[in-house]
């Protein structure tokens, strides 16, 4: 049977194996009648090539053909071939073995071919069933055209021209290769080797090929293609070389296999690149997360170690030890804390940058591990600063306490030494029985002397009480040598009590003897009575002139100077009293000379001589100018301290308002930035540089503060700004400008990633600022909802809650400007999705629902292949080999849609 069926759209001169219009396969080169009379060499080539091509597909179904004109006669393998290459199911074949069953099966195959837009010309089922070789080869060629060549498209060309253009482009760089057709251009085998080398340079050493060895070149290409590219050998090298013009259809069929093999590889490469891109983003984000965790852990560990040190309030017994503690604290403030402040600021910047990158890549927001949130670090930092302030206050309080203790201890030692010097020998004197052998006058003298002693003793009562009071105060202030103080004080008190007892006993004895004795020297008594208090006054003056003091201001020093001047004003009257006392002694001597008395040496009523009074008076006169000089030196020191206070206050009163103004200015800049982001960044960088340049003023102020600390000046009434206030304000200013610069940098990232114009950013900023009612760079949920409604969003409670989870993933209760921009641009962004990554993995897996480690290592770079293998869960579906991996769950986890 001879059917002459022309495909739709064929005009005059078009052949049976070419299509017209949209289904054009190839141009007709010869008339159909000539095509029926194939050259025997061409027929041999076609028969071998078409058989190999059919078997390359039939083997997927577990079968093959041996004789092309015989094995397709019953139509069964023909239908199976079409199902394999099309991926579609054909009607159920007839199982009978009679001729009409075979014709029916072949017709089902031909109808399926026709349903694909191909009109068969002169090919009928009867010819195929009868084993007509020419018709069978023509039918197979039609199938090859439709299913292997028609879909080839390069630029504006398709089918044969597209395949030829593809070959020309791929082989263009190679020497001795000039592909112009599908027959003679392939005879020397170099074109096939060039195609293989272009895509798999590891398989062929093209430089070693020779144009004069066509059979060797062809066999090399055939063997490599069959072994490594899964392309069966469809041609014989000898047939191609020995034929003047090899069969075009055979060559096209074989070359099309290379196109499909390499096109699939290119598609896999594209899929691998997409996966690599996604994995690179994910790995970079994980690296940032790990860096954040490491930096946060180190900062928190430093705070954990530092806080106990600052909380330690165990005082030191000596001033030098406390001074060392103060120096350690200054070193901490100057050397150890500033780098940690920078780390804290950098930690916040890294966290914001990471969250921005995660939002831009549609990854879930980063949630640090427990206890390492930015808020946790801020809380820990606030706790550190609180104990730090308390530690500094405690240090200064302890130093003042030790100063007070040192002053009291020195005063106690001085007064105790004076008292002990006064009491030295008094007990031995009171225990004497000299009155037993004395005359009346001597007894009276002893009695009067004793009265003078009692007067002196009474005068010392206040000193003893003062010594006891000093000891009590030292105990109350926890003086570290309180035990020795108590022991000495107790010895003084015991001795004083004993002196009182002995004094009373001696008086009783003298009064008993007084009844027997009548002579008394009134003048000596008068001398004793006046000299004793004057001597007391001298002792008190000497003690006061040698007294130590502790002052903290010019006013206190002036008060001491005034008291000293008042004391000097009493000296003339004291000098007159001294003259009167010395006059009494002179009168005694005159009377003795007048009446020829020979008294015992010294005054019987007092051990004090006029020489003693003169010596003490000379001591007082020497101590007065010395105390004048000491007080003037102290006044000069306090005046220097006052200048230091005023110098510090002048700088602090300028720096404090400057810092406050800059903080407010940065706040205004953050709330109302104008101009392009680059201009804003330049302005902020200039502000940052101005702030950095101002650091020298802070350093000078620190120097003045250091001088005040070294001079032990701890108060300053000339300014409300302490060094701590300046430090806190300076750290707040640095943090504020760094945070604002980071926000603009994130806006640049968002703009570049989302493709926003400056006008759009300005519009977003204007809307955001309008509803930022608190002017703190953040909108509260009600303000954010009002902003969305004003922009035309119709929001219900559920929808608004969903939007809030997007813009506020950490549930902070506010919407930042960065989150606002991200929401407004989210719908227009072109980003990767989990579905795209799944599709890419499916290409690498050859349309399987799982992928093997070998396929990952073959298609991906080694590092990222191993990353996928470690992270992918085992595939749990049926029919998978051991070690198969679930790429679907892995892709979803990359975008937060499931757990890794």
Swiss-Prot record:
CDD domains: CH_ACTN_rpt1, CH_ACTN_rpt2, EFh, SPEC
Ranges for region Disordered: 1-26
Domain EF-hand: 759-794, 795-830
Binding site for Ca(2+) 1: 772, 776, 778, 783
Entry annotated with the keyword Metal-binding: yes
Binding site for Ca(2+) 2: 808, 810
One record GO biological process: regulation of the force of skeletal muscle contraction
GO MF: actin filament binding; calcium ion binding; identical protein binding; protein-macromolecule adaptor activity; transmembrane transporter binding
Region of interest (Actin-binding), ranges: 1-260
GO cellular component: brush border; focal adhesion; sarcomere; striated muscle thin filament; Z disc
SMART domains per UniProt: CH (SM00033), EFh (SM00054), efhand_Ca_insen (SM01184), SPEC (SM00150)
Domain Calponin-homology (CH), chain residue ranges per copy: 44-148, 157-263
Keywords: Acetylation, Actin-binding, Calcium, Metal-binding, Repeat
Effect of disrupting the coding gene: Knockout mice are morphologically indistinguishable from their wild-type littermates. Their ambulatory activity, and exploratory behavior is similar to that of wild-type animals. They show no sign of severe weakness and fatigue sensitivity. However, knockout animals show reductions in muscle strength (grip strength), increased endurance capacity, reduced fast fiber size, shifts in fast fiber metabolism toward oxidative (aerobic) metabolism. In addition, knockout animals have higher muscle glycogen content and a reduced activity of muscle glycogen phosphorylase PYGM/GPh, compared to wild-type.
N-acetylmethionine modified-residue sites: 1
The Spectrin repeat ranges on this chain: 287-397, 407-512, 522-633, 643-746
Tissue specificity of this protein: Expression restricted to skeletal muscle fast (type 2) fibers (at protein level).
Biased composition (Gly residues): 10-24
Protein family according to the UniProt entry: Belongs to the alpha-actinin family.
Summary of the function given for this chain in its UniProt record: F-actin cross-linking protein which is thought to anchor actin to a variety of intracellular structures. This is a bundling protein.
Subunit-level organization: Homodimer; antiparallel. Also forms heterodimers with ACTN2. Interacts with MYOZ1.
Name under which the protein is recorded: Alpha-actinin-3
Originating organism: Mus musculus
Designated gene of the protein: Actn3
């Amino acid at each position: 049977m001879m059917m002459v069926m022309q495909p739709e759209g064929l005009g005059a001169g078009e052949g049976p194996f070419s299509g017209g219009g949209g289904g054009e396969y190839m141009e007709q080169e010869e008339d159909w009648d000539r095509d029926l009379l194939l050259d025997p060499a061409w027929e041999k080539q076609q028969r071998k090539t078409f058989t190999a091509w059919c078997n390359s597909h039939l083997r997927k179904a577990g079968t093959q053909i041996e004789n092309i004109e015989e094995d397709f006669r019953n139509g069964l393998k023909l239908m199976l071939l079409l199902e394999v290459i099309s991926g579609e199911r054909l009607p159920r074949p007839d199982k009978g073995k009679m001729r009409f069953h075979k014709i029916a099966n072949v017709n089902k195959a031909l109808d399926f071919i026709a349903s694909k837009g191909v009109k068969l010309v002169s090919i009928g089922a009867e010819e195929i069933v009868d084993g007509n070789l020419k018709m069978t080869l023509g039918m197979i060629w039609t199938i090859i055209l439709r299913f292997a060549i028609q879909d080839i498209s390069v630029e504006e060309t398709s089918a044969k021209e597209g395949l030829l253009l593809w070959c020309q482009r791929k082989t263009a760089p190679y020497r001795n290769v000039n592909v112009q057709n599908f027959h003679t251009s392939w005879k020397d085998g170099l074109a096939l080797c060039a195609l293989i080398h272009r895509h798999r340079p590891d398989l062929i050493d093209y430089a070693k090929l020779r144009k004069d060895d066509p059979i060797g070149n062809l066999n090399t290409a055939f063997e490599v293609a069959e072994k490594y590219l899964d392309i069966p050998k469809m041609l014989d090298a000898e047939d191609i070389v020995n034929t003047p013009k090899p069969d075009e259809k055979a060559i096209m069929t074989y070359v099309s296999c290379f196109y499909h093999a390499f096109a699939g590889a290119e598609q896999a490469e594209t899929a691998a690149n997409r996966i690599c891109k996604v994995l690179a983003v994910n790995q970079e984000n994980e690296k940032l997360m790990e860096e954040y965790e490491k930096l946060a852990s180190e900062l928190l560990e430093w705070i954990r170690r530092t806080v106990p040190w600052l909380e330690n309030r165990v005082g030191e017994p000596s001033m030098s030890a406390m001074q060392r503690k103060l120096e350690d604290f200054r070193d901490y403030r100057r050397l150890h804390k500033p780098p940690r402040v920078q780390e804290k600021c950098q930690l916040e910047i890294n966290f914001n940058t990471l969250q921005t990158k995660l939002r831009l890549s549609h990854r879930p927001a980063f949630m640090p591990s427990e206890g390492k949130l930015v808020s946790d670090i801020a809380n820990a930092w606030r706790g550190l600063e609180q104990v730090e302030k308390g530690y500094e206050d405690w240090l200064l309080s302890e130093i003042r306490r030790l100063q007070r203790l040192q002053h009291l201890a020195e005063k106690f030692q001085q007064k105790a030494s004076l008292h002990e010097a006064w009491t030295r020998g008094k007990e031995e004197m009171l225990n004497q029985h000299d009155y037993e052998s004395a005359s009346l006058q001597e007894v009276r003298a002893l009695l009067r002397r004793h009265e003078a002693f009692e007067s002196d003793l009474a005068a010392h009562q206040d000193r003893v009480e003062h010594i006891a009071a000093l000891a009590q105060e030292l105990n109350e202030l926890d003086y570290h040598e309180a035990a020795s103080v108590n022991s000495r004080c107790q010895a003084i008190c015991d001795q004083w009590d004993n002196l009182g007892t002995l004094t009373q006993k001696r008086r009783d004895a003298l009064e008993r003897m007084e009844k027997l004795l009548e002579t008394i020297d009134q003048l000596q008594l008068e001398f004793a009575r006046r000299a004793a208090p004057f001597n007391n006054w001298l002792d008190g003056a000497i003690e006061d002139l040698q007294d130590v003091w502790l002052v903290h201001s010019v006013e206190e020093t002036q008060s001491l100077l005034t008291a000293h001047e008042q004391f000097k004003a009493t000296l003339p009257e004291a000098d007159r009293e001294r003259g009167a006392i010395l006059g009494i002694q002179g009168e005694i001597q005159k009377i003795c000379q007048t009446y020829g008395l020979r008294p015992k040496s010294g005054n019987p009523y007092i051990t004090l001589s006029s020489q003693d009074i003169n010596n003490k008076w000379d001591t007082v006169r020497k101590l007065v100018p010395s105390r004048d000089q000491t007080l003037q030196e102290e006044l000069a020191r306090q005046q220097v301290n006052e200048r230091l206070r005023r110098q510090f206050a002048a700088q602090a009163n300028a720096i404090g308002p400057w810092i406050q103004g800059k903080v407010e200015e940065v706040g205004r800049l953050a709330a109302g930035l104008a101009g392009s982001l680059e201009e804003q960044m330049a302005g902020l960088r200039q502000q940052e540089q101005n702030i950095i340049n101002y650091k020298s003023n802070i350093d000078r102020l620190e120097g003045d503060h250091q001088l005040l600390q070294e001079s032990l000046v701890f108060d300053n009434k000339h300014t409300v700004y302490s060094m701590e206030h300046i430090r806190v304000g300076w750290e707040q200013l640095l943090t504020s400008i760094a945070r604002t610069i980071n926000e603009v940098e994130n806006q640049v990232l968002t703009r570049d990633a989302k493709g926003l114009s400056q006008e759009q950013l300005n519009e977003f900023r204007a809307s955001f600022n309008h509803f930022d009612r608190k002017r703190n760079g953040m909108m509260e949920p009600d303000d954010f909802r009002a902003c969305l409604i004003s922009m035309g969003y119709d929001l219900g409670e559920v929808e608004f809650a969903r939007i809030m989870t997007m813009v506020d993933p950490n549930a902070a209760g506010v919407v930042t400007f960065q989150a606002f921009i991200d929401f407004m641009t989210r719908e227009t962004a072109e980003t990767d999705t989990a579905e795209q990554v799944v599709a890419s993995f499916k290409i690498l897996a050859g349309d399987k629902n799982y992928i093997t480690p070998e396929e990952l290592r073959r298609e991906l770079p080694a590092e990222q292949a191993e990353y996928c293998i470690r992270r992918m869960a085992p595939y749990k579906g049926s029919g998978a080999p051991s070690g198969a991996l679930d790429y679907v769950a892995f892709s979803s986890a990359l975008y937060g849609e499931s757990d890794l």
